[in-house]
């Protein structure tokens, strides 16, 4: 049984993070963790994982519109392996196609005054988590 969940929108400069639960099938943006060339600030990510203590971690897999791997797909897969080893949680990969576009659209719909990268990345993680929850 799933308890709390964390979703991650992997990126080379920032990693968006959201939390959610299967009971309500809702996701909430937590924020972002800075990354340097795809390597996250592990200390910050450690704090988030410790605080939320998720049963599972869902990571967006960057594929193109035809579900082919992109230049960043291998980095995301390597990151997912590191997350699984580091936190000893089940890690699920899900196609994240259009998650950033959907996040931007949602922010524009609520007329967010500042569509920042931080908001977009965290909200993209919500989109990833909501998609995964609807399929599981």
Curated annotation (Swiss-Prot):
Domain of life: Bacteria
Stored SMART domains: YqgFc
One term of GO molecular function: nuclease activity
Entry keywords, A to Z: Cytoplasm, Hydrolase, Nuclease, Ribosome biogenesis
EC numbers, comma separated: 3.1.-.-
Pfam families with a match to the protein in the record: RuvX (PF03652)
Principal subcellular localization: cytoplasm
Signal sequence segment: none
Gene3D superfamilies per the UniProt record, alphabetical: YqgF/RNase H-like domain (3.30.420.140)
GO annotation terms (biological process): rRNA 5'-end processing
Cellular component, GO annotation: cytosol
HAMAP family: Nuclease_YqgF (MF_00651)
Job of this protein: Could be a nuclease involved in processing of the 5'-end of pre-16S rRNA.
PANTHER family: POLYNUCLEOTIDYL TRANSFERASE, RIBONUCLEASE H-LIKE SUPERFAMILY PROTEIN
Family: Belongs to the YqgF nuclease family.
Listed name of the protein: Putative pre-16S rRNA nuclease
Organism: Francisella tularensis subsp. tularensis (strain SCHU S4 / Schu 4)
């Amino acid at each position: 049984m799933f308890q709390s969940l964390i979703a991650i929108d992997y990126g080379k400069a920032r990693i968006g993070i959201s939390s959610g639960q299967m009971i309500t099938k809702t996701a909430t943006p937590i924020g972002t963790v800075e990354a340097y060339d795809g390597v996250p600030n592990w200390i910050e990510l450690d704090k988030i994982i410790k605080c939320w203590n998720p049963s599972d971690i869902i990571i967006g897999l960057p594929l193109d519109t035809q579900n082919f791997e992109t230049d960043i797909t291998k980095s995301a897969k390597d990151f997912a392996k590191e997350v699984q080893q580091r936190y000893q949680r089940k890690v699920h990969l899900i196609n994240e196609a259009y998650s950033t576009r959907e996040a931007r659209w949602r922010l524009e719909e609520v007329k967010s005054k500042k569509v920042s990268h931080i908001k977009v990345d965290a909200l993209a993680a919500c989109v990833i988590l909501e998609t995964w929850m609807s399929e599981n």
